[in-house]
Amino acid sequence: MHASLPDANTLIARLAESIAPTFAPETVIVGIHSGGVWVAERLHALLKCASPVGALDISFYRDDFSRIGLHPQVKPSNLPFDLENRVILLVDDVLHTGRTVRAAMNELFDYGRPASIRLAVLVDRGGRELPIRPDFAALTLEVPPHQNINLSRLDDGHLTLSLA
Amino acid sequence: MNPQLTPDGRLRHLLTLDGLPRATLTHILDTAESFMDVGEREVKKVPLLRGKSIFNLFFEPSTRTRTTFEIAAKRLSADVVNLNIATSSQTKGEAILDTVDNLSAMHADMFIVRHSQSGAAHFIARHVAPHISVVNAGDGRHAHPTQGLLDMFTIRRFKGEFHNLTVAIVGDVLHSRVARSQIHALTTLGVPEVRVIGPKTLLPTGVEQLGVKVFHDMAAGLAGCDVVIMLRLQNERMKGARLPSAQEYFKFFGLTPEKLALAKPDAIVMHPGPMNRGVEIASEVADGPQSVILPQVTYGIAVRMAVMALLAGGAST
């Protein structure tokens, strides 16, 4: 199944191409831990974004906290810019139920009121449980509920998509 | 079985650090680290405990501990109710349980308990419904686990590791629930040498059994230390026959710049507060470059947030 998924780096390049025509230099890029940050860092370079890349860990905003508790390794969010009235490109690796994106938007608003938020994902795998749609998706495919798409990063920085 | 843990190892209550596994302590400290960022944001709140009701049940007054628990709970978006209940015959045994039953009927989710009697938090924890967690905010001479944890958090932040440290706890160990919690945490986290320093009248008999070295002389006890933890001296100890006078105590066991110079040059100085300046610690030391007393207060909020979040969500280790 692994071999059937496209190369992640090719997908990121494709994603950057689709974003570029409407990407303003003052836009800030924010990735969602962990995979979204890896993708955001690549997009940041490809789109020649002027502001530093931001990172969100949405663990404190999850709607399933009371059921499953805290993720054991919460990383602090890092937004090294003022969000007020900024255009934000929110980036995640895989869009599934939409709950992670909802949590990320809730957290962003605790840092300020952005002018707008646009969503870019590497893969839109379907299975949405909330009315959330990506503005940019490099790959759209239907994946059965029992399967997961994972983005992993090797020590040399190489990104790989796998289906399990 | 440890009453603080569920059969599958999750944290159910926090009553004492005695007997808690190292992995649990480390998990709490790691979680606190992730909460540090929240206090520095413009909106100092996360929605983790939204809709939860936390009752600060203080049978013994303590403004600072109560306030830090309250801030921590509010930063987690919980609803907090403070109950300061004067210690009297009304706060013993069945009367305490009546209070707890009433608050449980108001759909409490967590009790933060301070009481002058050792074991009060355990007593309440044995009684509460399964969905309610109890945090001991200090009981008699027994334990003050969140203070112990915030001290460990402070040490880790300034020293990085525990395995190569010499830590001295100075003062009234006999009456100190804080010292007991510190000793349990330090030994569990692998500090190779924990020293207690104080006059014979203020050190418990057999304290060596807790795995500490005993010193009655500050110069010998402080030599080569990485961390110096000063304890608060309660005024009532002066009135009893345990100590001749505050001046005499300060002369032998007060931390002055001269005595601190005997520890390692990069040693940090800690104090659980509130301080008696000129009794257990000199102002030059309390406000000096080696003092980490104010960071301790800041860290206390993150640590208490971590404890409450893990209790409410389950602390799987």
From Swiss-Prot, chain B:
GO terms for cellular component: cytosol. GO terms for molecular function: amino acid binding; aspartate carbamoyltransferase activity. The lineage of its organism: Bacteria, Pseudomonadati, Pseudomonadota, Betaproteobacteria, Nitrosomonadales. The gene is pyrB. Belongs to the aspartate/ornithine carbamoyltransferase superfamily. ATCase family. InterPro entries: Asp/Orn_carbamoyltranf_P-bd, Asp/Orn_carbamoylTrfase, Asp/Orn_carbamoylTrfase_sf, Asp_carbamoyltransf, Asp_carbamoyltransf_Asp/Orn-bd. It comes from Thiobacillus denitrificans (strain ATCC 25259 / T1). Heterododecamer (2C3:3R2) of six catalytic PyrB chains organized as two trimers (C3), and six regulatory PyrI chains organized as three dimers (R2). Its EC number is 2.1.3.2. Catalyzes the condensation of carbamoyl phosphate and aspartate to form carbamoyl aspartate and inorganic phosphate, the committed step in the de novo pyrimidine nucleotide biosynthesis pathway. It catalyses: carbamoyl phosphate + L-aspartate = N-carbamoyl-L-aspartate + phosphate + H(+). This is Aspartate carbamoyltransferase catalytic subunit. SUPFAM superfamilies: Aspartate/ornithine carbamoyltransferase (SSF53671).
